Curated annotation (Swiss-Prot):
Keywords: DNA-binding, Isomerase, Magnesium, Metal-binding, Topoisomerase, Zinc, Zinc-finger. It catalyses: ATP-independent breakage of single-stranded DNA, followed by passage and rejoining. It is an enzyme of class 5 (isomerase). The active site is at Y304 (o-(5'-phospho-dna)-tyrosine intermediate). Releases the supercoiling and torsional tension of DNA, which is introduced during the DNA replication and transcription, by transiently cleaving and rejoining one strand of the DNA duplex. Introduces a single-strand break via transesterification at a target site in duplex DNA. The scissile phosphodiester is attacked by the catalytic tyrosine of the enzyme, resulting in the formation of a DNA-(5'-phosphotyrosyl)-enzyme intermediate and the expulsion of a 3'-OH DNA strand. The free DNA strand then undergoes passage around the unbroken strand, thus removing DNA supercoils. InterPro entries: Topo_IA, Topo_IA_2, Topo_IA_AS, Topo_IA_cen, Topo_IA_cen_sub1, Topo_IA_cen_sub2, Topo_IA_cen_sub3, Topo_IA_core_domain. GO terms for molecular function: DNA binding; DNA topoisomerase type I (single strand cut, ATP-independent) activity; zinc ion binding. This is DNA topoisomerase 1. Transmembrane segments: none annotated. Pfam families: Topoisom_bac, Toprim, Toprim_C_rpt, Zn_ribbon_Top1. Belongs to the type IA topoisomerase family. GO terms for cellular component: chromosome.
Length: 800
């Protein structure tokens, strides 16, 4: 028995019908091994050794693979024809070697095919090769890079920016693009401008529209007319002018078809034309590739969908040209096949473009046999494939220049018509941001023909900010920058949404506050690693590894040395400095240009500033604790410390010193913020004495003496000079206080409560008691105001 292993049951089912009884086709159900999500899965100090585990989910499938492999005379590894597929095959081979004690590599045969057809499968089985270690190493390097970034940068994020979930090597760069576009939009200042339209009638009374372009030989620029008065004055002048056709220019323009689909262009066009997300597009394309039931049989309808190559096989081109000639006629067929070259930065072009496996499977014939969305995507791929080998579209363009009698004013009218529809017969590509109006036909015009002015219309416009990224335009931008690969685009977009860093509204990406915090932090403290050129450079290095031009562990070492140094440096960075930088970077976004927006809306005297709490970032009033206003800046955050204290976050356990008995005093971070701790906790049932860090107190300013005083609270500072009762100073939920005869009296911010004198305390007590007495009603009109606290305190009698 010869064992064939593929990734999915659907693929196995389709392939099985093309092979004889001597073959058994089984599925691995995707990856069988991966780096576990824990520390130590990649060990840089051990030459980047990688510790793979068989996932719990894959366990039963691995058992079946091992069992069948024991009976097999050879194993055909028929996973997808890219780096990831090569990696899956390598992992399967490694597990079989380990479990079945297979020593010879000849036992394994790697077969790769770009489409699941009988011809392609048979050819692959008859022409096996060995596993390509270069491709495997490139995929291992990518996985190691992603792991090292994720498992070193993410924990640092948790410590420095509570509430932020993770950072990834490529996702962070995509997030930066979205955030920077939002910054552009926020800072954009709209400007007013005007243009003038002329509604004209030719000698046959046929209406057309022209636009004013010149005044006294001066070309009108975008901002030549900037207000209503200028526009109206000019409109009045034009009403008295007589115009004629000064010049007519005619020319033809050829429009060439777009290349066949690659992964990114398929995702972009499916988003524009069908409204599919990148993830949905790839899920459907995967099914169309692996095989779908079309009634009489299960077949793979399209070629492999993860590709950046734009070439088509000679056989495919021949079949496409035959169909064009048969169904559309020879005038739609170019004299020779069209050949395309990729414009994608760092394109691998190892595979064909995405095309139907059999161009004679006409979409309309399959409409009733395919699920609705499957049909839509297949039709899109089929039409694009046909169109890419069809004749050009030919456009007739007409430009008419209109002039006033003395040529003081010139206007222009443009028109276009399709002289030959060419590939438009089958397919027309969409664009992201289409103009409001396309060129229209002009009526017949002759030079020197006199025209009638029907209407002069001043049009007001305002400049608009750049549009937010759609899925299509973001994928296009990533592709242009050379960031990511065909297999990663959909995942990048999904991860950003899953982690609540961005939302997709009206098919446009909007960054959440959490995403902006992460981006500001990374740009400020890891700028090199979120630079577009650097990330594209890493992709290029992975390509060089795949081509055997670069040793993969050497590439990992070059990256890790600098990145790890950066991590260590930021780890030592003071949280106050980080908060200060983040606030400065987000200042315009949070407060805008109006300085009054920083004024606390509650107390009207304090100033709002950024704080970080256990649930993330929030704004707090500088008058805390007198003013307890705070507001989360993270949308959807219900736990925004609205009833807690505004705190900075301390990230390290720090020893401040020892007391007289030699016990160490610690500054630590807890779930509710920084605190002081007396000694180590040696018994899990007995907690050492602790004291929260007062709000507004910078943890870097805490001294041993201050810490000891905090731990001694509540502290007796003396006895009241009149009543003889003890006076205590403490610190609680609402800040520092004086405790006197069962009453709690807040200590204003202007006092240093840790060094409060008895005289100051007595003054605050008296003010408080007088305030209480003043608020008491006196319905009996008594001569003496009753002392509500204690009769031992003497009070003056009021006059009747």
């Amino acid at each position: 028995m010869k064992l064939v292993i593929v990734e999915s049951p659907a693929k196995a089912k389709t392939i099985n019908k093309y092979l004889g009884d001597e073959f058994k086709v089984i599925a691995s159900f995707g990856h069988i091994r991966d780096l576990p999500s824990k520390k130590g899965s990649v060990i840089p100090d051990e030459n980047f050794s990688m510790k793979y585990d068989i996932s719990e989910k894959a366990g039963k499938y691995v058992d079946a693979i091992i069992k069948d492999a024991k009976k097999a005379e050879s194993v055909y590894l028929a996973t997808d024809p890219d780096r990831e597929g090569e990696s899956i095959s390598w992992h399967i081979a490694e597990v079989i070697k380990e479990k079945n004690k297979v020593k010879s590599d000849d036992f394994f045969k790697r077969v790769a095919f770009n489409e699941i057809t009988k011809k392609a499968i048979t050819h692959a089985i008859e022409n096996p090769r060995k596993l390509d270690n270069n491709l495997v190493n490139a995929q291992q390097a990518r996985r190691a890079l992603d792991y090292l970034v994720g498992f070193t940068l993410s924990p640092l994020l948790w410590r420095k920016l509570p509430g932020c979930k993770s950072a990834g090597r490529v996702q962070s760069v995509a997030l930066r693009l979205i955030c920077e576009r939002e910054d552009e939009i926020e800072r954009f200042k709209s400007e007013e401008y005007w243009d003038i339209s002329l509604k004209m009638l030719n000698s046959n009374n046929e209406l057309f529209t022209a636009k004013l372009t010149h005044i006294n030989d001066q070309k009108l620029e975008k901002f030549s007319i900037t207000n209503d008065k200028e526009a109206k004055d000019l409109t009045e002048k034009l009403k008295s002018q007589n115009f004629h056709v000064d010049k007519i220019e005619k020319k033809q323009q050829k429009r060439q078809p777009q290349p066949p689909f690659i992964t990114s262009s398929l995702q972009q066009e499916a988003a524009r034309k069908l409204g599919f997300s990148a993830k949905k597009t790839m899920q459907i394309a995967q099914k169309l590739y692996e095989g779908v039931d079309i009634g009489k049989e299960t077949i793979g309808l399209i070629t492999y969908m993860r590709t950046d190559g734009v070439t088509l096989s000679n056989d495919a081109v021949d079949e496409i040209r035959k169909l064009i000639n048969k169904d559309y006629g020879d005038k739609y067929l170019p004299s020779s096949p069209r050949i395309y070259k990729s414009k994608v930065k760092n394109a691998q072009e190892a595979h064909e473009a995405i095309r139907p496996t059999n161009i004679n499977y006409i979409p309309n014939d399959l409409k009733e046999k395919l699920e609705k969305d499957y049909y839509k995507l297949y039709e899109l791929i089929w039409k694009r494939t046909i169109a890419c080998q069809m004749e050009n579209v030919i456009m007739d363009l007409v430009n008419a220049t209109l002039a006033s009698e003395n040529k003081e004013y010139l206007a222009r009218a443009n028109g276009s018509t399709i002289a030959f529809d060419g590939f438009y017969k089958v397919y027309r590509e969409s664009i992201d941001d289409e103009a409001e109006e396309e060129n229209k036909m002009l009526p017949p015009l002759k030079e020197q023909e006199h025209l009638k002015t029907k209407e002069i219309i001043p049009n007001q416009h305002f400049t608009e900010p750049p549009p937010r990224y759609s899925e299509a335009s973001l994928v296009k931008k990533l592709e242009e920058l050379g960031i990511g690969r065909p297999s990663t685009y959909a995942t990048i977009l999904s991860v950003l949404q899953d982690r609540k860093y961005v939302t997709l509204e009206k098919k446009r990406f909007i960054p959440e506050e959490l995403g902006r915090l992460v981006t500001v932090f990374l740009v400020g403290f890891f700028k090199k690693y979120v630079e577009y050129d650097f990330t594209a450079g890493l992709e290029n290095e992975l390509d060089e590894i795949a081509a055997g031009k670069l040793e993969w562990k050497s590439a990992l070492g070059n990256f890790w040395n600098g990145f790890n140094h950066n991590i260590e440096s930021v780890n030592k960075q003071n949280i106050t400095e980080i908060i200060s930088y983040v606030q400065q970077a987000l200042d315009y976004h949070i407060f805008g240009e109006n300085k009054d927006s920083k004024v606390c809306p509650s107390c009207k005297t304090g100033e709002l500033s950024l704080k970080l709490g256990k649930f993330g970032a929030f704004l707090a009033c500088s008058n805390y604790p007198e003013c307890n206003f705070r507001k989360s800046i993270v949308s959807g955050n219900d736990n925004n410390e609205a009833d807690g204290e505004a705190k900075d976050i301390v990230n390290e356990n720090k020893v401040l010193g020892k007391d007289k008995e030699g016990i160490e005093i610690y500054l630590k971070k807890g779930p509710y913020g920084p605190y002081i701790q007396y000694g180590e906790q040696v018994d899990s049932k007995i907690k050492p004495k602790r004291s929260p860090l007062p709000a507004g107190l910078n943890q870097n300013d805490i001294t041993l003496d201050m810490a000891l005083k905090l731990l001694s609270l509540p502290l007796k500072i003396g006895n009241h000079k009149e009543s003889g009762e003890e006076v205590l100073v403490g610190y609680g939920k609402f800040g520092p206080y004086i405790k006197y005869m069962g009453k709690f009296i807040s200590i204003p911010k202007k006092y240093d409560f840790l060094n409060l004198s008895l005289d100051d305390a007595m003054k605050l007590i008296e003010e408080k008691l007088n305030a209480i007495a003043a608020k008491q009603p006196n319905p009996l009109n008594m001569d003496e105001v009753t002392n509500l606290v204690d009769k031992k305190i003497k009070v003056k009698k009021t006059k009747k």
